[in-house]
Structures are given as structure tokens and as C-alpha cells.
UniProtKB/Swiss-Prot annotation:
Residues that carry a glycan: N74
This protein's GO CC annotations: extracellular region
Cellular localisation: Secreted
Listed name of the protein: Evasin P1074
A molecular function (GO) term: C-X-C chemokine binding
Leader peptide range in chain numbering: 1-28
Purpose: Salivary chemokine-binding protein which binds to host chemokines CXCL1 and CXCL8.
Primary localization: secreted
Paired cysteines (S-S): C48-C67, C52-C69, C63-C80
């Protein structure tokens, strides 16, 4: 009885190992990326023609044409940038 149980457990472990090897080899041979990214769903960032500067009161000058001000660190001059694409910001209003 004990011999049969040990043999059964060894066979079960062997089958599990073969199953894992088969799954790994099937996924490793795949040439496609796992998450398809289409250019239709991407976001395009581009700089606008204007620059923005920090005023003496600490506020930044406004960018126009759907652009916003981007600056690095403590710099007092930045560039206006626009994002185009399929993105959705969550609403600040509670859902009904």
C-alpha cells in the first residue's frame, strides 16, 4: 500500500513538472508582446511655441491653446506643452 502511494505521488509531481515545462516553452516561443499597444490609444506630447515664466508673486504665466507650463526644479523659465491623445481624467464630481 505504501509503495503504491509513493509511486502515485511521484507520478503526480512528474506530471506537474511536465505541465509547467510545456506552459513555459509555449509562452517563451511567442514572438508577440503580451500587451498590444496601438498608436490609436497612445498619447502624444509636443511643445508649444510659447515659453512661460514665473512672476514675482510666484505664479506662472499662462500658456494658451490647450498648453500647460512645464518647468524643471527651481527654474524660473519653462516651456508650454500640449498633450494630445486618448486619455480620460477622473471627474472630481461624485458619480450618481
Amino acid at each position: 500500500m505504501a509503495f503504491n502511494m509513493i509511486t502515485f505521488l511521484q507520478m503526480a509531481v512528474f506530471v506537474v513538472i511536465l505541465f509547467n515545462i510545456n506552459l513555459h516553452s509555449a509562452s517563451a516561443g511567442s514572438k508577440e508582446s503580451s500587451a498590444h499597444q496601438s498608436s490609436d490609444d497612445s498619447i502624444k506630447a509636443e511643445f508649444c511655441d510659447a515659453k512661460c515664466t514665473m512672476k514675482t508673486d510666484g505664479k506662472w504665466t499662462q500658456c494658451h491653446g490647450g498648453c500647460f507650463c512645464v518647468h524643471v526644479g527651481n527654474e524660473t523659465e519653462g516651456r508650454c506643452m500640449r498633450l494630445d491623445g486618448d486619455y480620460d481624467y477622473p471627474s472630481t464630481q461624485p458619480e450618481e
